[in-house]
């Protein structure tokens, strides 16, 4: 790493963040956590923490706030689902409160289980997909008293709980996260001491991190082995906060930035990717982690991203580094800068795992609501840029649906798309939330009529050939696929098709390239006569209702277009009409894939 290594910052004066497009099947959602919104969660580790004092006999929570009734989401979830509908989102990420479900060891509350079943069913009834987090910073008091994840043997209790909740919600929840942000849980609870259990013990922090990651692996394989386990996606949610040198010329700043990035981000990612890693900070902790089963313990990875921090190194053993803000940065109420470029960086970092990515949290605290519109536009632009660069992102969840109890910050931080008056529980949509709503509901065609974009995963469908043979597009993974949308009444198609025959079909048909013509809105006999008239031999498929066409483009748009899909199922090139330069560029794109 060099002192001249460029800082990733974009010139926003030259960028139009509204000029973006997301795939039609992209998941849009909001997120909450049980303790922050449900209310009356008084049997978990955070309840104890809120009512305790620090070493100076001061409240551990800003303004001595208590979660208390919170946003009363437990009783008001039906109304909150209506708010989600108003936003236009189709996914909702929330956590189940372990302490409600298993208030005593081995004793399960049927009423609590039924509540979560009814919540999931009501979401589905409103065409909103439930996304469940099993552990979002809280667990029962009895588990805390046993030592929680400080002891390896305690993981069996969390695995047992996970099995129970899976069996209860099976068939209702297709996407599951085991843990929310283990790195934050460890950093705040065992390094900084501002989350429960309030310890400052780097060695114990390494143990807890290892035990949580191993518990994730156990839960993944356990749930996958159960009936119905093969139908769900299971992942873990990883927070990334980049640590960048405050002074790019300073060796200490670089060194401590690297150490922090390694222990906070790279170590757990390497464990999940390779099954082994090291939790290491010089002079503080050096814990080797190994579990071969971790290598295949993810169907997806969740990314929570907010910002970055600048690190200043010091020649001081008591305080070897501190965090500093730059004067030019626009700051959120949480004290970190607006840094959309970091979302792009984080997506590239986490893509090393080779699994689909969901941005499971992204948002800001902004009491004035003045920064929120710019924040949303820029971060969604960064997300779209990652998609264009072929990073496999499947969805985005804004944090949060509504204002909530923000852990050690209490009720001071206003993250919600909806403002909450905690005296009356009235929810009011913030004006600054509009860019998010507009993007969620924007997903129509682009200027050329396409509903998909380069970098998207190609929508799957059944190909029905004129020969009567059928196969699914997904089954063609491993080959380059060129879809040519056509129709007998399309004069441009008739001109283009002989060129496709010569330049693609005859040249590459035995080299791993599938050229498939998709004829829209016409019966078999018309399609067969059409193929005979133009003199082509590459296979044609039937699309009588233009349903396949409608997966890729607005049905009211022109038919002449080609879609090039790589061996992994990603769209890499799109054409419209038959323009010579674009056509040659398409041929070059196909050749580059071979």
Describe every region a protein language model picked out:
Residues 495, 504-546:
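Conserved segment of the thioredoxin-like fold in thiol-based oxidoreductases
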Residues 485-502:
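Conserved redox-active cysteine motifs that mediate thiol-disulfide chemistry
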Residues 482-483, 515:
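Hydrophobic beta-strand anchors of alpha/beta hydrolase catalytic cores
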Residues 532-537, 543-591:
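Thiol/disulfide oxidoreductase modules built on the thioredoxin-like
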Residues 445-460, 477, 529:
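N-proximal helix/coil linker or "cap" segments that precede and/or mark the start of modular domains
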Residues 76-97, 300:
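Catalytic domains of carbohydrate-active enzymes, especially glycoside hydrolases
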Residues 2-56, 60-61, 103-105, 113-372, ...:
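Active-site region of glycoside hydrolase catalytic domains
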Residues 461-481, 552:
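A short beta-strand-turn-helix
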